UniProtKB/Swiss-Prot annotation:
Residues 153-657 form the GRAD1 domain. This is Putative GreA-associated domains protein. SUPFAM superfamilies: TPR-like (SSF48452). It comes from Treponema pallidum (strain Nichols). Residues 1-152 form the GRAD2 domain.
């Protein structure tokens, strides 16, 4: 039946077609039925019955081609058959989330005023990572309802997507919403403005930071205000507004400093002819030397400024009290320290008290040390500060284990995007999703990125743009490659595993495993290139499941894989001769398979319980390996173990030479 008589179709009619599909499945003739429908569509492209049956069978087999369902929904949608469209969408969604079905269902609900519209839209934006407008509509809805958490979630999603689409006006609108909702998360705004500048051009992101600046100025957080203004000036050092504002912020921050106006004057920060960053640097160096401030000298250590008199400082060092120094000399010879700097704490607190605090509260210690060094520090530097001055080498071992766990799991820390080994302290706790996303970008090792992806799947929300970006990274390895190496195979296995769990993700798999394997020059090399133990076994199992001559490939792989599972699989599938032959070949070509021979020796010894079967030192092996082959065969098939109580190297006859 064709589209001329759409009135003949109802939900019941499609249920009849479902019964036909179910019967075909019971008789194992789904492929035959689909073939008949596809052949019919070649002549009648709008046949409703053929489109439905072919589309549903494709869906049930998880085939990528959804053209039949697209055509079917378009036909009924264009003819305003919303009840049929709803039924078809519901049927499609029985097989899993579908952008096509959810979008069509949303249109139906919008037309009919169905209150389930927002639920459908929420499902849609969680799987369609390009949909931005509906995402913003959902965010607006949650904001109006007073649900700050959900509003923030969806405004963030909308912002990511508008940035990707380079929609400047929409970015500005959503940015303003987020500044009102989460102004304290300044790291988020720094990160996103960088993306905006990369996508839309230098300076676009820094202009948006003015909105964030207004909030911190109203709350008199002068340090954050100054940092934002510095960032704006980095993009345009001639920005007159930012220059005037930073001078005003310096006056507010240091309003009690006796030399404030003098230092502003000598820095020439208000003079347009002076480079703004040189002026800022001069001012901050001078202003940091005030009564009560801590300083560090490379020879005398930590000291405290006792008095400032014009251009002269009076400083108390631990072993050099009341030392005088000119301000000009102090600027070049001394480093100013905050009161919470680890060096200051070491100098003013009793060693045993500070050591006890560090042992009891590793998270506090990490925050102190990391912020002491420009909020960018690795564990190597942490160890330098703690061992042996506060912790012994033995104490460090257990303490560092706790520290690594805290750095990995605590939302108060984040990896440096430029170097995965360095960490920063967050002023506002980062979500686990954002923390893992930053680690993923900072991590340069391919297989370490797989570990992060796995952690994200286990512990975080996979319905996020951050997870999609991770998934797309592995997808890119399958879109274009010149050589099939360990990374390509690992990417295929990861994409396959993830898309099996999350079928709505658009997996790029133009080639099946067998096709990829056919292009591998050296399977043993590829196996060694895969650094993840689980993926190694997925690779080996995939060879058996998808490669027609898998038994021959197992023979090739065995000397590298070295697992009884390889030999057992050959034996159980009727390839006993190949299993025994591969063992014998290892001995015949001992020079090329030394590791395999040693492994076989140890495996047989453990399997048969012989303790006297020791491998002689500096021994070679002859080709007479019949006894070994027999032993391996016995251990594989579970036969009666040979008596090996008195088995020694001499028992092997000419095996040892």
């Amino acid at each position: 039946m064709d589209t001329r008589d759409l009135t003949a179709y109802s939900a019941e009619k499609f249920k009849e077609l479902d019964r036909i599909i179910a019967e075909a499945k019971r008789q194992s003739i789904l492929d035959v039925l689909k073939g008949i429908c596809d052949e019919h569509l070649a002549h009648s492209k709008n046949s409703i019955i053929a489109l439905y049956i072919s589309g549903i069978i494709s869906l049930s087999k998880q085939l990528l081609d959804d053209s039949c369902l697209v055509t079917l929904l378009t036909i009924f949608g264009d003819n305003h058959k919303n009840q049929i469209v709803e039924h078809l969408c519901t049927r499609v969604l029985e097989y899993g989330e579908s952008k096509l079905a959810l979008r069509a269902l949303g249109e139906c609900y919008k037309t009919s005023g169905n209150e389930q519209l927002y639920d459908v839209w929420e499902r849609l934006v969680r799987i369609d990572y390009e949909e931005a407008e509906i995402t913003r509509v959902l965010a607006d809805k949650y904001e109006q309802e007073g649900n700050k958490e959900k509003a923030t979630e969806f405004y963030k999603k909308a912002l990511y997507r508008f940035i990707a689409r380079r929609q400047n006006a929409a970015i500005k609108e959503v940015w303003t919403k987020l500044v009102a909702l989460i102004p304290d998360d300044v790291e988020f705004f720094y990160r996103e403005q960088k993306k905006i500048s990369e996508k839309l051009g230098e300076g676009r992101g820094s202009v948006l930071m003015q909105d964030v600046y207004v909030y911190y100025k109203e709350n008199e957080d002068w340090t954050t205000c100054i940092n934002i203004l510095k960032h704006i000036l980095e993009h345009d050092e001639k920005d007159v507004w930012a220059r005037k504002e930073i001078i005003e912020n310096f006056r507010c921050k240091y309003r009690g400093h006796s030399q404030l106006e003098e230092y502003l004057k000598i820095s020439n920060i208000s003079q347009s002819w002076r480079n703004v960053f040189e002026a800022i640097n001069d001012f901050e160096k001078h202003i940091s030397f005030d009564e009560g401030s801590f300083v560090f000298h490379r020879t005398w250590g930590v000291g405290r400024i006792a008095k400032v008199c014009n251009d002269e400082l009076l400083i108390d060092f631990a072993k050099r009290r009341a030392h005088t120094m000119l301000l000009k000399m102090a600027i070049s010879a001394l480093q100013t320290l905050g009161k919470e700097h680890i060096w200051v704490l070491k100098s003013v607190l009793k060693r045993q008290d500070l050591a006890a605090k560090i042992r009891q509260d590793p998270e506090w210690a990490l925050k102190v040390i990391i912020t002491s060094f420009d909020n960018n520090c690795n564990l190597k530097k942490v160890k330098q500060e703690l061992v042996p001055s506060l912790l012994s080498v033995g104490e460090w071992t257990s303490w560092s284990t706790k520290a690594r766990k805290i750095l990995k799991e605590s939302t108060g820390f984040a990896a440096n995007p430029s170097n995965i080994d360095f960490y920063t302290v967050r002023s506002c706790p980062v979500s686990l999703e954002e923390k893992l996303a930053v680690e993923f970008k900072a991590q340069k090792n391919f297989f370490a990125r797989i570990d992060i992806l796995n952690t994200f799947m286990d512990k975080a929300d996979t319905d996020s743009d951050a997870f999609r970006e991770m998934f797309d990274y592995f997808n890119t390895f399958l879109r274009a490659f010149s050589v099939v190496d360990g990374n390509v195979i690992a990417a295929y296995l990861v994409v396959t595993r993830v898309s099996t769990v999350l079928p709505h993700l658009n997996a790029c798999r133009p080639h099946g495993f067998a096709d990829l394997y056919a292009h591998i020059a050296d399977p043993r090399l590829v196996y060694t290139e895969i650094k993840d133990k689980g993926l190694k076994w997925e690779f080996v199992n995939s060879v058996k499941n998808f490669v027609s001559n898998w038994s021959d490939e197992y023979v090739k792989l065995f000397p590298e894989v070295l697992s009884l599972e390889i030999l057992r699989a050959l034996m159980e599938e009727g390839y006993k001769e190949k299993a025994l032959r591969v063992v014998e070949a290892c001995f015949e070509y001992y020079a090329d398979n030394r590791a395999a021979v040693i492994w076989l020796f140890k495996t047989v010894r453990m399997s048969l319980g012989s303790r006297s079967c020791a491998l002689p030192q500096n021994s070679g092996l002859s080709s007479s390996s019949t006894l070994w082959t027999l032993l391996i065969g016995k251990s594989l098939t579970g036969g009666t173990p040979l008596r090996t109580e008195n088995l020694t190297a001499g028992s092997f006859g000419t095996l040892w030479e």
